[in-house]
């Protein structure tokens, strides 16, 4: 039986190489952020405007403490090399995780993850409420200040570039040190990057926004990987999609905080809130056990047994390992392009890129395009389209979990492509028919969010345990890549493309995705993860 090294401490399935180093790092990061608060308070009498102020000594010391804290906490989480190179095929029955009934432990995990997702999504959501105040304080160029020199969109670009980097970085990290440990490290990142609220210069705000994006972009994919490996197969699909729908709660909470706090404490308070929410995030992680599947794949049977017992799974050993099918899967990025997974990786990559181009292209430019065409009620139209489409989220969850995951993706992608081609055909004349405008808008406004949610769940199901975090990270990163291109157009002052142009840019990859899913997609509905992997190996043989 695999024994743990004596110098390793464990907490609910998380392996700490040095527990003292980890918690020392958390304290250092928190203290470093607190050292920035006096700088923020110095601006109280001038509306908390810090632009142009020099950094004081406590801030510089605090920044050093944060850097050291990040290094120390990662060292505390990083497992010994022997734990990451195990090729032992555990004989513990993995099927027991899917045979277990949905218990209060599962419900607790789902609720905790819903809160975690809300905290995570609050970060990029806050950007919309931060931009007006930051634009005025730093004299940035935007519709609020057309005479500015530096485009305000640089902030959004740095953030989304960070999310792309974070998706791939955390994808690697999640497969290296574990799902829960990676989520915990993202929480520490939330704490540290909250100093953005005390940065006096716009350049430092850009740097902090990039780092914040890295933490945000990495956490969500790992959450989906953990849920996929923990929730019983018969409930996995629909429950995970509903967790993704919790994003709406983040928008509501952030808008409420902005309304209540920004008029008094300025836009900076929305970044500084990252300190208490980040600490809460770390504390919540105590109720998120490590993935038993990840532990078994690492040969850490003793820890896996404890996690399985927590979820009511009967721990039974079998003569032949159910994980043997994954024994030849290498823990590296190149596996995503291997013969067994190339087809599904093409599906994920194309669908992610297409959804990103629609989300950050069509949906980003549609308010501007409608106003250019004289439609002064564009904001109300977009809001109404989103509200009309929201109830359909529950229909999608049912379809994915009880009808067919593959057919659901094909249907959503087809509807999105058809609606976008409708805009291509009708063009600017669409504003002359309000009923047609609403009909065409509902799908890309609501539907693309459903596509992103379904893609996140699907990518967590189709890759084996050894590379599951990389797979979900790849899906998340590819979906943001389109956003990088579209927001860059704003930064460099390129005129807004027409409705027909941005619709065509999104319609082409969405149409291609339909064919890729049809030919290379694999059905995941109510199927065990190991069964899905075995099917992929059989198809590639």
Regions found by a protein language model. Name each.
Residues 1-9, 41-45, 62-99, 287-341, ...:
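Intracellular cytosolic loops and amphipathic helices of Major Facilitator Superfamily
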Residues 36, 115, 121-132, 337-394:
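Extracytoplasmic gate region of multi-pass secondary transporters
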Residues 48-56, 130-164:
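Extracellular/periplasmic helix-loop-helix junction of adjacent transmembrane segments
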Residues 125, 159-168, 251-252, 389-394, ...:
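Residue-level signature of mid-helix packing/kink "hotspots" within the transmembrane helices
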Residues 167-178, 392-405:
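Helix-to-loop junctions at the C-terminal end of transmembrane segments
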Residues 181-195, 408-422:
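Structural signature of the two symmetry-related core transmembrane helices
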Residues 198-208, 263-266, 425-439:
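Helix-loop junctions at membrane interfaces in 12-TM secondary transporters
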Residues 235-265, 272-281, 476-486:
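Glycine-rich segments within core transmembrane alpha-helices of 12-TM secondary carriers
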């Amino acid at each position: 039986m695999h024994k743990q090294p004596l110098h390793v401490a464990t907490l609910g399935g998380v392996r700490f190489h040095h527990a003292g180093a980890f918690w020392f790092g958390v304290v250092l990061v928190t203290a470093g952020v607190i050292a920035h608060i006096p700088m923020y308070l110095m601006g109280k009498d001038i509306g908390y405007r810090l632009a142009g102020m020099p950094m004081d000594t406590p801030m510089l010391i605090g920044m050093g403490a944060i850097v050291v804290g990040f290094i120390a906490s990662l060292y505390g989480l990083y497992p010994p090399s022997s734990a990451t190179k195990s090729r032992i095929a555990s004989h513990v029955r993995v099927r027991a995780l899917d045979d277990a009934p949905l218990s209060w432990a599962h419900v607790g995990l789902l609720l905790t993850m819903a809160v975690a997702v809300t905290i995570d999504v609050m970060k990029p959501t806050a950007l919309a409420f931060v931009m007006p105040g930051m634009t005025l304080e730093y004299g940035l160029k935007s519709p609020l200040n057309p005479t500015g020199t530096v485009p305000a969109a640089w902030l959004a670009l740095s953030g989304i570039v960070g999310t792309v980097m974070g998706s791939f970085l955390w994808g690697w990290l999640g497969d290296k040190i574990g799902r829960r440990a990676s989520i915990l490290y993202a929480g520490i990142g939330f704490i540290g990057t909250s100093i953005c609220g005390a940065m006096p210069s716009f350049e430092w705000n850009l740097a902090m926004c990039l780092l914040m994006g890295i933490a945000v972009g990495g956490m969500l994919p790992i959450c989906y990987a953990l849920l996929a490996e923990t929730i019983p197969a018969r409930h996995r699909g629909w429950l995970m999609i509903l967790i993704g729908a919790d994003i709406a709660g983040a928008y509501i909470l952030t808008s409420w905080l902005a309304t209540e706090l920004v008029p008094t404490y300025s836009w900076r308070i929305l970044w500084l809130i990252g300190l208490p929410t980040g600490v809460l995030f770390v504390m919540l992680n105590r109720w998120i056990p490590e993935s038993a599947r990840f532990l078994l794949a690492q040969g850490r049977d003793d820890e896996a047994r404890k996690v399985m017992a927590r979820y009511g799974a009967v721990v039974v050993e079998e003569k032949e390992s159910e994980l043997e099918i994954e024994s030849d899967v290498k823990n590296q990025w190149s596996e995503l392009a291997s013969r067994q997974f190339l087809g599904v990786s093409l599906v994920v990559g194309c669908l992610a890129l297409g959804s990103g181009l629609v989300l950050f292209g069509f949906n980003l430019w549609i308010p501007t395009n409608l106003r250019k065409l004289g439609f002064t009620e564009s904001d109300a139209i977009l809001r109404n389209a989103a509200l009309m489409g929201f109830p359909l989220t529950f229909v999608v969850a049912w379809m994915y979990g009880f009808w067919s995951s593959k057919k659901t993706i094909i249907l959503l992608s087809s509807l999105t492509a058809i609606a976008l081609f409708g805009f291509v055909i009708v063009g600017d004349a669409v504003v002359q028919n309000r009923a047609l405008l609403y009909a065409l808008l509902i799908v890309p406004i609501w539907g693309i969010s459903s596509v992103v949610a379904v893609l996140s769940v699907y990518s967590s199901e189709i890759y084996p345990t050894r590379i599951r975090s990389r797979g979900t990270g790849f899906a998340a990163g590819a979906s943001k890549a389109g956003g990088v291109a579209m927001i860059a157009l704003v930064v460099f002052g390129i005129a807004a493309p027409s409705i027909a142009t941005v619709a065509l840019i999104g319609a082409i990859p969405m149409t291609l995705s339909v064919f890729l899913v049809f030919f290379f997609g694999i059905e995941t509905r109510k199927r065990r993860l190991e069964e899905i992997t075995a099917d992929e190996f059989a198809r590639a043989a």
